[in-house]
C-alpha cells in the first residue's frame, strides 16, 4: 500500500510540487549577519540578525546601501592563529572559501565558512581570538565601513 502511494505521488508529480510548496513556505534565503561589538564591560559580545530586503523587480530584493571605504582581499593559511585583539576598524569580513573560528571570552566559538558575513565592531576592549580551521587556505573580503556609517540593520 505504501509503495503504491509513493509511486502514484511520483507519477502524478505530487512530491516535486510538495517540495516547491515547502520552499515557498520557507520564504527567500535571508541575509544573516553575525555582529561582534564591545559591551559595557569591555568584552566582545555577539549578536545575529537578518538584513531586511525589499523587492526591486523580477526576482530581485535589495537591502539599504551601506557606506564603505574600500574592499581588500585576504588569504590566511591553516596556521593562522591570532591571540586576543580588537577589530582594527568597523568592517565586514565575508568568507569566500575555507573556514575560520572566532573565540570570545568564556570559550564561546563562532565558526565562519563560505558565505558567512561577520560585522566586526569590537574595536575597543579585549577583543576576540581568530584562528583558521581545516587544512586549506581561507579567502575572505575585508570591507571597512565609512567613518560615521551606521551599523546596517
Where are these regions (language model features)?
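N-terminal secretory signal peptides that target proteins for export/translocation
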Residues: 1-6
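Short beta-strand His + acidic residue motifs that chelate non-heme Fe in jelly-roll/DSBH
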Residues: 83-84, 102-103, 120-121, 126-134
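Short acidic-glycine-tyrosine-enriched beta hairpin
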Residues: 106-122
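Short, conserved beta-strand element in jelly-roll/cupin
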Residues: 77, 85-102
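A short glycine-rich, His/Asp/Glu-containing loop-to-beta-strand
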Residues: 40-84, 138, 146
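A short hydrophobic beta-strand segment most commonly corresponding to one strand
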Residues: 119-123, 133-150
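Short beta-strand segments in beta-sandwich/barrel cores
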Residues: 81-82, 99-103, 117, 148
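Bacterial N-terminal signal peptides
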Residues: 9-23
Amino acid at each position: 500500500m505504501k509503495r503504491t502511494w509513493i509511486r502514484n505521488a511520483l507519477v502524478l508529480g505530487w512530491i516535486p510540487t510538495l517540495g516547491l510548496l515547502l520552499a515557498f513556505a520557507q520564504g527567500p534565503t535571508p541575509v544573516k549577519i553575525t555582529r561582534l561589538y564591545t559591551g559595557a564591560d569591555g568584552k566582545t559580545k555577539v549578536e545575529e540578525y537578518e538584513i531586511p530586503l525589499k523587492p526591486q523587480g523580477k526576482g530581485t530584493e535589495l537591502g539599504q546601501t551601506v557606506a564603505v571605504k574600500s574592499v581588500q582581499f585576504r588569504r590566511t593559511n591553516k596556521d593562522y592563529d591570532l591571540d586576543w585583539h580588537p577589530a582594527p576598524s568597523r568592517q565586514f569580513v565575508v568568507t569566500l572559501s575555507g573556514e575560520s573560528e572566532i573565540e570570545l571570552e568564556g570559550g564561546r566559538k563562532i565558526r565562519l565558512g563560505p558565505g558567512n558575513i561577520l560585522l566586526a565592531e569590537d574595536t575597543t576592549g579585549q577583543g576576540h581570538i581568530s584562528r583558521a580551521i581545516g587544512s586549506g587556505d581561507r579567502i575572505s573580503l575585508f570591507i571597512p565601513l565609512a567613518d560615521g556609517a551606521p551599523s546596517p540593520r
